[in-house]
Every structure is written in C-alpha cells, then in structure tokens.
Amino acid sequence: MTGTLAGKTAIVTGAASGIGEAIAKLYHAEGAQVLAVDLAEPGLPADARMALLAMDVTAGDAPDAIIAAAQAAFGGLDILVNNAGICLPGSIEDQSLESWDRVFEVNVRALFRITQAAVPLMKAKGWGRILNLGSIMSDFGGPSLCAYGASKHAVAGFTKSLAVDLGAYGITANYLQPSAIWTGMSKPFMEDPDFRAYWEGKAPAGYIGEPEDVAAPALFLASDAARFVSGMGFRICGGAMARF
C-alpha cells in the first residue's frame, strides 16, 4: 500500500461522525491502519486496515482497552488522534457543576488518560504523532461556552507540555483549532440563522467549513513531513480569526 501514512497505525477517537470520521477515512485512504473508536461502533467499512471499536473513552478501562485493540489488530501504534469531545453550553450563572465536570471528563481527562497509555508504545519506536482536537476556543472565549472553552484551553496547555516532554523521543504533539464546522455537535448552533450568518460573514472565505477541511491538516501533522512541527495550534477557520 502506498500513501502518506503507509505502514503507520492510527487510533482515532470520536470516529463515528464529523471530524473524527473524516480523519479516519483520510488516514485509511492514505495507507494507514486505523482503529476507529466511538461510543457506538463507527459505521465505517471495516477491512484489513480499518478496525472498529465501540468504547466510551471515559470508561475506567478505556485506555488499556483501546491500546490493546490497536495492538491486536495491527501490532502497534504510531498516531493518536484524540478527537472525542462534547459541548454542554452554559454561562457562569447557569452551568451546573455536573455539566462542567462531564465536559472536562470527556474533553480533558479521557484525552490525558488515553495519551498516557499510548506514549510508551511511541517511545519504544522512537516515533509518534499525537494530535488533539482543540478549538478556536483554545484561544478565545464565547457566549455560553464556559466549560467548553475552559476545556479547550486545557487541551492547548496539555499539548504544548507534551511537545516539550516528548520531543527528544521523536514524538510530536499538536492540536487542531477548528472554528464553526458542519458536524453533528455544531448542528444545534447551525440551526440558529444568526449564528450561521455570523460565521459565514466573519470568514473571508465566505462559508462554513466541512469536516474534510479539518482532516487535511490532520494528515500533514501525522506525516513524516511534520517532524519539526510540535506544540502548535492550527486554526482551521477560513481566515475568520485573521479579521480584526
């Protein structure tokens, strides 16, 4: 098999739809062996290079189970994409502690635990790529995004620290920062015509991005070509955040 990721094994969480599904499909098309993970088994076509796993990333045994599944299917691990995430909107006055904790449990704690389980395999190879899903909210705030915004700031800080800790082992760590993208998670927001008009107007590109627009830079960051790129956030926003 030829392709940018030929011979590499990738784990992609949150792979049943949206950005995670687009990344899993593109990695597979570019030659990678992919373990696609989601709460319900992803509907991707399983084959010799695509394995599917139904797993709650917050479960106590999730990190070990996910790593074991990748090893059983493909014999190792090279690339980890921590894409699984949730958004439970709420301002400081109405965000419940339960919803705050749940956002951090999925968006930060699970990401940390799975990464912790994956790193030894990458260290043993002397090569690895860790790609976390941040957001433009990793740098900014937004209305009623108290918990979500804080969790994505945490993803940015965690990823930068990973880059410092792991660079000597041939492992890079970066995070993607999409703005509004057409996904299942964004659907409740996209149904608001004012929200949609805001992002279409803010982006010089004049439209809202698709999951495939996020998958393309995710491919580069997982490749050998990105060996000197680490600790960075990549904004995928159609130029929206360049506008004053």
Regions found by a protein language model. Name each.
Residues V81, G167, T172, V229-G231:
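Short, small/polar-rich loop/turn modules that mediate ligand/substrate recognition or access, typified
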Residues S91-I92, S99-F104, F195, W199:
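Substrate-binding pocket helix/loop in short-chain dehydrogenase/reductase
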Residues T115, S151, T159:
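Active-site helix of classical SDR
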Residues P120, V164-D165, R227:
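Alpha-helical segment proximal to the catalytic Tyr-Lys
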Residues S135:
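Residue(s) in the substrate-gating loop at a strand-loop-helix junction
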Residues F140, L219, S230-F244:
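Short C-terminal tail/terminal secondary-structure segment
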Residues A203-V214:
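A conserved structural motif in NAD(P)-dependent oxidoreductases
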